[in-house]
């Protein structure tokens, strides 16, 4: 579909908008005027005419698709394989559990601290499993979001969030 843009005076633009609305009877068009601007909208296009002191400006608005094509994308009618559902359920049950890391890890992106080392004696809480997002299975490198609270000298308690693999932590008593 090709769309052209024409530059015209504000009076001509308003009369052309009403003529376009009358000429295309099969496409419902709506014309509204508010605060020195006229808007012509249809199911196929949306044009906004703005009047200024020197000239009229014609802007083309894009429409957003509300439904995806049924031949592509995620089909909600088909069910996922049972082993994926069991794995998802098993991983979602871990959310809220207290965990410890198995070996020391360095965390670099902590505000106002150069680096923090997580040791096996520190306890964190799993906040989220990110392997299932917006109805689709994804394969993140570090699927578990774990929150730690550490005491830093001269700053008090600092909350930091770390993404970990399942092999990097062990679950302790809930």
From Swiss-Prot:
Keywords: Chloroplast, Oxidoreductase, Phosphoprotein, Plastid, Transit peptide. It holds the Pfam family FeThRed_A. Its main location: plastid. Residues 69-81 have a biased composition (Low complexity). InterPro entries: Elect_transpt_acc-like_dom_sf (IPR008990), Fd_thioredoxin_Rdtase_alpha (IPR004207), FTRV (IPR044166). GO terms for molecular function: oxidoreductase activity. It is found in: Plastid, Chloroplast. The modification Phosphoserine is found at residues 70-71. Residues 69-89 are annotated as: Disordered. Residues 1-62 form a transit peptide. Variable subunit of the ferredoxin-thioredoxin reductase (FTR), which catalyzes the two-electron reduction of thioredoxins by the electrons provided by reduced ferredoxin. Heterodimer of subunit A (variable subunit) and subunit B (catalytic subunit). Heterodimeric FTR forms a complex with ferredoxin and thioredoxin. This is Ferredoxin-thioredoxin reductase, variable chain, chloroplastic. The gene is FTRV.
